[in-house]
């Protein structure tokens, strides 16, 4: 199979907010198509290592799916913010810790319809903050100290779905 060319025609913004929604028009193999695209700032995800065998996870309510989810601390990169700056901020906001950040990888989360690129970091040598940063008003976050082997099991048993 070859990489045939896609020819961009137009994009129309249909919602312009912190997250944008647009409709793209393009041609492929002589046919015209339209696709809905969510424009989302890049984001960060942090794996906070408490020790060699233990990490911090969080449990927080996610409105879009109407449930609490167990996940790694994460959040969007604000305008003019570098990925490691966002990771430092999110780690402090969501866990009350600071640490040494090491870049791990990055990946698109849902590239069939969303532009969000998540940068992953490992945080080591964690220190509890004396005056933790306040969470966003709509956040209710519970921190969980979890054995690394249990966190891996959570990925397989459905405890971690985000």
What are these regions (language model features)?
Residues 1-11:
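A short, amphipathic edge element
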Residues 9-45, 51:
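Acidic, metal-coordinating catalytic segment for phosphate/diphosphate chemistry
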Residues 16, 64, 110-113:
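Short glycine/serine/proline-enriched coil/turn segments at secondary-structure junctions
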């Amino acid at each position: 199979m070859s990489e045939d060319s896609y020819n961009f025609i137009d994009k129309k913004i249909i919602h312009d907010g912190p997250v944008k929604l647009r409709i793209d028009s393009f041609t492929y193999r002589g046919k015209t198509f339209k696709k809905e695209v969510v424009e989302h700032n890049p984001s960060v995800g942090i794996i906070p290592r408490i020790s060699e065998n233990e990490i911090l996870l969080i449990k927080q309510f996610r409105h879009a799916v109407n449930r609490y989810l167990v996940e790694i601390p994460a959040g969007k990169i604000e305008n003019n913010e570098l990925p490691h700056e966002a990771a430092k901020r999110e780690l402090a906001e969501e866990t009350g810790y600071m640490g040494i950040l090491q870049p791990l990888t990055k990946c698109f989360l849902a590239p069939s319809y969303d532009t969000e690129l998540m940068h992953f970091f490992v945080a080591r040598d964690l220190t509890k903050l004396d005056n933790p940063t306040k969470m966003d008003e709509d956040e209710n976050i519970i921190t969980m100290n979890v054995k690394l082997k249990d966190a891996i099991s959570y990925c397989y048993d459905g405890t971690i779905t985000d």
